[in-house]
Amino acid sequence: MWNSLKAFALVFGGCCSNVITFETLMSNETGSINNLITFCQFLFVTCQGLPEFLDVHQPFPYFKPLKTPLHVYVITVVLFYISSTTNNNVFKYNISIPIHIVFRCFGTVITMFTCWLLNGRKYTKIQILSTLFLTIGAIIASLFKDADFRYQDLKLQAWKIGSDQSVDLTFIFGICILVLSSFTSSLLSAYNERTYQKYGKHWKENIFYSHFLSLPLFLFSRKQLIHEYRVMRKSERILCSNFGGKILVPREETLLLFNVLTQYFCVKGVNILASKTNALTLSITLLVRKFISLLLSVRLFDNNLSYTGYIGVYLVFFGAFIYSLGSIHPRQNDKGAIKKSK
């Protein structure tokens, strides 16, 4: 029980804080540093977990025996790397934050489908209904965050799309990346669920090796990483107080440090939760977390949320509520699915 509460605290605290620091870094005037952010997040998690999985008491240091086979982590690494890098780099292709949220909201539906297809999991009518409420609410709140829904505006937008002959290929490419990111993220959730069922819930090992084995893949983007590091070094200095007075520190590097720390807590919470629950519960928890972040953004950055947007938020929380009610009863289908996967 305590581990579950700890996981929820890490997810909602760490992930929400991480989104705030990430969006602040995204709004910098020096340029995009998305690849550098992702690399630093992976490197920090690897360094933090290294002492636990590296045995240094022998003449030659070596990694402790794996509890989960290496070939399982190879698939995890591929899915995790693709999901993380595409998710952080999609903003380069004319994708706005609302569009990003809308597509990521479909992750819950995709997760339900992949778990049904790959793991043989069956869901109750209440769970399916709650997922629909969550997804529809997420889309409404994202699309109508700033302005209320009006039928005339919808007709005008449809007319513009129909009459516009030019095609924004950059935007289309960005949408394709978003679709890829959503599918790989859902596949990763379903794959982790099966891994935990078959080999045990070794979430710490999963965190370490999914990040550690992903680091060599960043060699393919090493030139971009060097460029982004130089861009970050050009950021303005801000005045910070310390015990001896005040010092000037790089603004971007300070934000990056907080982003990396909060990402670690976020990843830790997500993996603990993944080991305690199923993939759909995890997906719904992350969806609700996104809307906590949305409400924090409205509050902290003086952004307005329309009445239509609030309707979407209410639908999200209502969907989460009825899903929790549907999850109280024992899941006989889940037990059958576990036996089937073995």
Swiss-Prot record:
Record bears the keyword Transmembrane: yes
Main location: endoplasmic reticulum
Name of a matching Pfam family: UAA
Stretches of the chain found on the membrane's Cytoplasmic side: 1-6, 57-61, 118-123, 190-253, 329-342
Topological relation to the membrane, as annotated: Multi-pass membrane protein
Record's subcellular location: Endoplasmic reticulum; Endoplasmic reticulum membrane
Stretches of the chain found on the membrane's Lumenal side: 28-35, 83-96, 145-168, 275-307
UniProt keyword terms in alphabetical order: Endoplasmic reticulum, Membrane, Sugar transport, Transmembrane, Transmembrane helix, Transport
Endoplasmic reticulum as UniProt keyword: yes
GO CC annotation terms, alphabetical: endoplasmic reticulum; endoplasmic reticulum membrane; Golgi membrane
GO biological processes: chitin biosynthetic process; transmembrane transport; UDP-glucose transmembrane transport; UDP-N-acetylglucosamine transmembrane transport
One example GO MF annotation: UDP-xylose transmembrane transporter activity
Ranges annotated as spanning the membrane: 7-27, 36-56, 62-82, 97-117, 124-144, 169-189, 254-274, 308-328
Family statement: Belongs to the nucleotide-sugar transporter family. SLC35B subfamily.
NCBIfam families to which the protein is assigned, alphabetical: nst (TIGR00803)
Function: Sugar transporter that specifically mediates the transport of UDP-N-acetylglucosamine (UDP-GlcNAc) and is required for cell wall chitin synthesis.
Designated name of the protein: UDP-N-acetylglucosamine transporter YEA4
